[in-house]
Design a protein with these regions (language model features):
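Short aromatic-acidic-glycine turn motif
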Residues: 231, 374-381, 454-457
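Exposed acidic/Ser/Thr-rich ligand/metal-binding surfaces
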Residues: 42-50, 146-365, 424-435, 514, ...
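Polar, glycine-rich mid-to-C-terminal structural blocks
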Residues: 311, 332-342, 347-409
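Sec-dependent N-terminal signal peptides
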Residues: 8, 20-34
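Subset of Sec-pathway N-terminal targeting signals
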Residues: 8, 42-169, 501-535
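Long, acidic serine/threonine- and proline-rich intrinsically disordered regions
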Residues: 88-91, 95, 103-108, 360, ...
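N-terminal secretory signal peptides that target proteins for export/translocation
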Residues: 1-21
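C-terminal motif of bacterial Sec signal peptides marking the signal peptidase cleavage site
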Residues: 37-40
Length: 535
């Protein structure tokens, strides 16, 4: 009984208080119907037969200070953006953030736990977005290249609160393309001379080469103390030639990544394919040490090139000196995505199984703005997206860069909600008039995006009605909320002191679903590893 279509007609409407972009108001895609209809649902359709908390162990969390003698990789660098605290809806009714489809934090966390290293750089949204969810996909003739799904249920770690799960699902239909113009930009500096770096890099790119054909071209640039062009616009079906270059790579020297980036973008521009997919794929540990090397210096360089229509994908490798903050910044400012490759299986996931998502953009500069109804929500906080938050006025600013979403990608965000007391006052936005003030809506999701290559945005609006609340959330909700709870426990969030890895594990294990690739089962195993290490 999973709702599969937009509930209500698609109609044109003027955005309340907005005049900037074409706006459509769409009835939110509810992952569940009204609560009364849920009693007949069974586990087979993703719904839980048991109540939400039945049989769940409420053991305490394992805070980071209990990691005893577990070492930390002190040379690794991560972004330290502060976690968002609760916001009062009466004074801050809007929450705005840029979309993010990166998944690097999850595979890096997996590497850290398997290595026996205390977790660092845990970004909630990247853990959640690592997994697939059964969101409805847009119809082939849909006006917008995505759907929006909202579901709200009780918070597992704070039963007096609620959790809102918002999912933006992009169409899996990739744009018509004249072929791929791809530049491999490969770090072959001395720091890459480790089995889990350059050899894994070469094997990973061999997998990618197998996905290409005669309509594609590949250039290969390497950099260490200086950069070198090893291939220039080689047809994709000359796989043997490309693989031979990859197998002969050797590491040595310093890391002049900025010059390598410059050369890679120049090659991409020289071979630019109008109507095609033009992309630089950077593979590195991020340890730039010659020339511009800080995230700020590199993003200044990247932003100029991002305007040219050339996208970037960043693949991180290795451990010990990983500069996660640098690689994430390059991807965020370069119209790109960022994945961390810890195993060949992960390379296969990113470069083969998710090839279209990694390579083809269907929505550019996608921003999300959530407007909360003070009649139903007193306070809220966004879980994750700590370095993707935007000022509210930046939502309408078409010059403000945001995240790009690939074919088949999904963007999932969780909000923790404090319910309003009965008779709460209303704000002066969508819920300002008397009739709206009596609304039982929880929130309204505004999504703003550009078609690839367009200069102006379109805004679509998805209200979340009272019917999206359920006491029997879907297996997707239960699993994803378990990922969130585990992340909160690992990071020792002061706003979720009761977050429990034990409870997260039990909920995740009970919500594995089909799990075709075994990724959800693997997550359960990672929680076990975490608890063993933390003692």
């Amino acid at each position: 009984m999973r709702a599969r279509s937009l509930m209500g007609a698609l109609f044109t409407a003027k955005a309340r208080g907005r005049e900037k972009a074409p706006t459509r108001v769409v009835a939110a895609v509810a992952a569940v119907a009204v609560v009364g209809a849920l009693a007949a649902c069974s586990g087979a359709d993703g719904m839980s037969d048991a109540s939400y908390h039945e049989g769940i162990a409420y053991d305490g969390s394992v805070p980071p200070e209990q990691w005893r003698d577990v070492p930390v990789d002190e040379q690794e660098e991560y972004d330290d953006s502060p976690e968002q605290s609760f916001q009062d809806v009466t004074t801050s009714p809007l929450s705005t953030f840029a979309s993010d489809v990166d998944t690097a934090s999850y595979s890096n966390l997996r590497r850290q736990l398997r290595q026996g290293v205390a977790p660092e750089g845990v970004r909630i949204e990247e853990l959640v977005n690592y997994f697939d969810y059964d969101y409805p996909t847009p119809d082939g003739d849909a006006e917008d290249p995505f759907t929006v799904t909202t579901q709200i249920a009780e918070s597992p770690w704070s039963p007096d609160h609620q959790l809102a799960m918002i999912g933006v699902q992009a169409t899996a239909a990739k744009p018509t393309s004249q072929g791929n113009n791809i530049v491999f930009l490969l770090d072959v500096s001395g720091s890459m001379d480790e089995p889990n770096k350059l050899p894994l890099l070469a094997d990973s790119f061999e997998l990618l080469v197998e996905q290409l054909d005669e309509d594609d071209t590949v250039s290969i640039v390497t950099y260490a103390g200086s950069d070198q062009v090893l291939a220039d616009s080689v047809p994709g079906d000359r796989r043997g030639e490309l693989v031979e270059i990859l197998r002969e790579l050797q590491a040595g020297g310093s890391t002049g990544g900025a010059q390598g980036l410059q050369t890679a973008y120049e090659l991409a521009a020289e071979n630019f394919v109008d109507g095609g997919n033009n992309r630089v794929i950077l593979a590195t540990d991020g340890d730039f040490n010659v020339g511009p090397s800080t995230p700020e210096q590199l993003t200044d360089l990247i932003e100029d090139h991002a305007k040219s229509g050339v996208y970037i994908s960043v693949l991180g490798f290795g451990m010990g000196n990983l500069k996660d903050n640098t690689m994430e910044a390059i991807a965020d400012h370069g119209n790109g995505n960022y994945a961390y490759i810890d195993t060949l299986d992960e390379a296969r996931k990113v470069l083969v199984d998710e090839f279209d998502s990694t390579m083809f953009v269907v929505a550019q500069d996608l921003k999300v703005q959530v407007e909360f109804n003070p009649a139903t929500v007193a306070e809220y906080r966004l879980l994750g997206y700590d370095n993707r938050r935007l000022e509210d006025e930046e939502f309408d600013d078409d010059t403000k860069d945001a995240g790009d979403v690939g074919a088949g990608h999904a963007v999932t965000a969780f909000y923790e909600l404090v319910p309003a007391r009965e008779g709460a006052p209303v704000d002066d936005l969508d819920y300002q008039d008397v009739e709206s003030g009596q609304s039982t809506d929880f929130l309204t999701v505004h999504v703003r995006y550009k078609q690839p290559g367009a200069g102006t945005s379109t805004e679509v609006v998805f209200p979340a009605r009272a019917s999206v609340f359920t006491t029997r959330p879907t297996s997707d909700f239960r699993f994803a909320s378990a990922v969130v709870e585990f992340a909160l426990a690992v990071t020792g969030s002061p706003h979720a002191e009761d977050a429990s890895p034990t409870r997260a594990r039990e909920r995740a294990e009970a919500a594995l679903g089909e799990d075709s690739y075994g990724l959800r089962s693997e997550f359960v195993g990672l929680i076990d590893t975490y608890q063993e290490l933390a003692g």
